[in-house]
A protein has these predicted regions:
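Helix-to-loop junction immediately C-terminal to a conserved catalytic motif
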Residues: 6
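Conserved ABC ATPase signature
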Residues: 96-100, 104
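A short, proline-enriched helix->beta-strand linker immediately N-terminal to the Walker B motif
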Residues: 115-119
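Conserved ABC transporter NBD signature motif
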Residues: 14-22, 34
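Q-loop/switch helix immediately C-terminal to the Walker
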Residues: 53-64
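P-loop NTP-binding/switch modules centered on Walker-like glycine-rich loops
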Residues: 126, 130, 134-200
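Conserved ABC ATPase "signature" region
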Residues: 22, 73-91, 200
């Protein structure tokens, strides 16, 4: 679902409406400006980071791809500022992914997704691979950023307590179909679909 929305996978049918535009069948060049405003945090912090790139280069990659900065100095300033926002430091910039814990790697992935200040971030099970002790830290980091910048999240998860904590609105999917959607409180107070009732 997440990879189809962001067009890593091609949709077989239907529409993907983003900012009033159907992006489901845009060509790669047409997707470029869309991608600047739509980023993704992947489920697996181990597989989603390039092992041959430093943390600095991983976070700088979107800035370079979208020609955001005019100089290497500006790139570094944005990278270091984002590292600080996700709870890391400039000293981490020269290291490689294998030198970090799972929670730190996911922070690097989050920094990469947020460095462009996108309108929408797709969070594909972003905490499921992390220790329980780290999960709340990562979720709070995302919430703090959202409150400061107004970013929207599409948070895909199976942990219903976490879903309730992070969501204003909830959609329930069953066998690839959206079977119910409502605001968070209504879903929990008055679930309508049998699958939703079973989850709760």
């Amino acid at each position: 679902c997440a990879r189809t929305i962001i067009r890593i996978y091609e949709p077989s049918q239907g529409k993907i409406i983003f900012n009033g535009q159907d992006i489901a069948h845009l060509k790669p060049r047409q997707m470029q400006p869309v991608r600047r405003n739509m980023q993704m945090i992947f489920q697996d912090p181990y597989a989603s980071l390039n092992a041959r790139m430093t943390v600095r280069d991983i976070i700088a990659e979107p800035l370079k791809a979208h020609h955001v900065c005019k100089s290497k100095q500006e790139v570094d300033e944005k990278v270091f500022a984002m590292l600080n926002r996700v709870g890391l430091t400039a000293e981490h910039a020269g290291r490689y992914a294998h030198e970090f814990s799972g929670g730190q790697r996911q922070r690097v992935g989050i920094a990469r997704a947020l460095v462009l200040n996108p309108a929408l971030v797709i969070c594909d099970e972003p905490i499921s691979a992390l220790d329980v002790s780290i999960q709340a830290q990562v979720v709070n980091l995302l919430r703090d950023y959202q409150q400061a910048e107004g970013t929207s999240y599409l948070f895909i998860a199976h942990d219903l307590s976490m879903v309730r904590y992070v969501s204003d609105d909830i959609g329930v999917m069953y066998l690839g179909q959206l079977v119910e959607s409502s605001d968070s409180e209504e879903i929990y107070k008055n679930p309508l679909h049998p699958y939703t009732k079973g989850l709760l």
